[in-house]
């Protein structure tokens, strides 16, 4: 069993996130959406098994800046997974706060590991996943969360987007992305869509200056 879970790639979290998102988008096709959600849930559990039973190898994997930044999609997927759990409103709120706390802790871990000191060699488009990803929490935010908290999350992730675009583009100009990692260039199209979706879902009205910049 342990050998099996050690073979589960952390990159599976990105596929799981995509499947959860697709399930939410086609929820009017109930049977298909539920099937996709079930498939995504199986993938989510496989990653959990990898984290628990293959922890030592996970620690080694997270020394790679691409793997470490893309793995933040696991926390994004966790928000979508938890939103469909049969919990009371209080339980959903506690789970949401707990996941947000874990995500913030992971951001701190990543920042301490890869930004001290900051090196362009360590910067990749997948950094958007880690620093803009928390915006997905607004897609499943409980009604009990104050508007000020929602606005803070949207504002911080919006500013992170504005800061990361020039940094990532400068890195790509100065140092070419290795061929192995070129597929992650597709991530560049995701941050703005996520911010817009999050602002709509949470009924937030971002500051005009941020909207103009985006």
Language model features with spans:
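Juxtamembrane helix-loop boundaries in multi-pass membrane proteins
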Residues: 1-21, 55-80, 96, 112-139, ...
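Membrane-proximal first intracellular loop
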Residues: 27-35, 49-66
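Aromatic-anchored, glycine/proline-accented short structural segments
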Residues: 152-212
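Helix-coil boundary and interhelical linker segments in multi-pass alpha-helical membrane proteins
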Residues: 23-32, 83-94, 139-151, 199-209
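Hydrophobic, membrane-facing alpha-helical anchors
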Residues: 1, 41-57, 99-116, 135, ...
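Structural signature of hydrophobic alpha-helical transmembrane segments
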Residues: 32-45, 90-104, 147-162, 208-214
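N-terminal signal-anchor module of multipass membrane proteins
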Residues: 1-48
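Long hydrophobic alpha-helical segments that form multi-pass transmembrane helix bundles
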Residues: 125-139, 143-164
